[in-house]
Curated annotation (Swiss-Prot):
GO terms for cellular component: extracellular space. Glycans are attached at residues 150, 250. GO terms for molecular function: serine-type endopeptidase inhibitor activity. It comes from the Eukaryota. The keyword Transferase does not apply. This is Putative serpin A13. It is found in: Secreted. Keywords: Glycoprotein, Protease inhibitor, Secreted, Serine protease inhibitor, Signal. Its main location: secreted. Residues 1-21 form the signal peptide. Pfam families: Serpin (PF00079). Belongs to the serpin family. It comes from Homo sapiens (Human).
């Protein structure tokens, strides 16, 4: 039976000037810097870390898919990369090298100083706010914890919960992990993205319909309907279809629909170059399609997955 991940939502964030990172979330979005034929801008610090970030994202996705067959996957790779990079900056030399190499960096090619500069540049660029777009990302280190700390672990956890709820506007709720007595520091990382469709669905055309989450199970969902022009292609080699839907605020979502039974084939074949190829081959077509309203929630433990 085919896994329930019938849609593969691969998201790229290209903030400002092609600083690339990957993300999956409730309505995954690709922030796109402009037309394909636009002239390239000057090199930015984040360019030097983009290739490693993309490669890390695909490797982590495959690990998540392998360890949770048939389950939905929701993660923000650049957030994980940034957290590990930030931890490395205060670590001993051996640990710092291990963390950065685990993220896919070759330190003889990209020095530590350039990696640090690139992540700070990316953090600044992955932010946007407007009437129809909100993108925030930040992290905070809570240190001075443990048996000899001035505050109890319960007080520290309360501060972390309050920070998380405030920064994510209550979308993530309280932080669920209990702090152990051996905990001396906590690094909290968050990302919030909300964007409206450029061509909104007609709410009057939405009606309850069945949606199959796998070959044998269906649920009733609010099914949106739209007839509009979107960029679309069918990849015969990877046996999938790709739909690009634009949002307000210069953002875009890529939805990837594998042919029946071909999800694993598609996952194994995905490369950073694949996204670039798709973006150049998409053509505008008049589409008449149904689209379910959906929500995804997922908790992942990464201790055994990260290199």
């Amino acid at each position: 039976m085919e896994a329930s991940r019938w849609w593969l939502l691969v998201t790229v964030l290209m903030a400002g000037a092609h600083c690339v990172a990957l993300v999956d979330q409730e309505a995954s979005d690709l922030i796109h810097s402009g037309p394909q034929d636009s002239s390239p801008g000057p090199a930015l610090p984040c360019h030097k870390i983009s290739v490693s970030n993309i490669d890390f994202a695909f490797k982590l996705y495959r690990q998540l898919a392998l360890n949770a067959p048939g389950e939905n996957i929701l993660f923000f790779p650049v957030s994980i990369s940034l957290a590990l990079a930030m931890l490395s900056w205060g670590a001993p030399v051996a640990s710092r090298t291990q963390l950065l190499e685990g993220l896919g960096f070759t330190l003889t090619v990209v020095p530590e100083e350039e990696i640090q500069e690139g992540f700070w540049d990316l953090l600044i660029r992955l932010r946007g706010q407007g009437p129809r777009l909100l993108l925030t990302m930040d992290q905070r280190r809570f240190s001075g914890l443990g048996a000899r700390a001035n505050q109890s672990l319960e007080e520290a956890q309360k501060h972390i919960d309050e920070y998380t709820e405030q920064q994510t506007q209550g979308k993530l709720g309280a932080w669920e992990k209990d702090l152990g007595s051996e905990t001396t520091a906590v690094l909290v990382n968050h990302m919030l993205l909300r964007a409206e469709w450029m061509k909104p669905f007609d709410s009057h055309a939405t009606s309850p319909k069945e949606f199959f989450v796998d070959e044998h199970s269906a649920v009733w969902v609010p099914m949106m309907k739209e007839k509009a022009s979107h960029r679309f292609l069918h990849d015969r080699e990877l046996q999938c279809s790709v739909l690009r839907m634009d949002h307000a605020g210069n953002t875009t979502t890529f939805f990837i629909f594998p042919n029946r039974g071909k999800m694993r084939h598609l996952e194994d074949a995905l490369l950073p170059e694949t996204l670039i190829k798709w973006d150049s081959l998409l053509r505008t077509r008049e589409l008449d399609f149904h689209f379910p309203k959906f929500s995804i929630s997922r908790t992942c433990r990464l201790e055994m997955l990260l290199p």
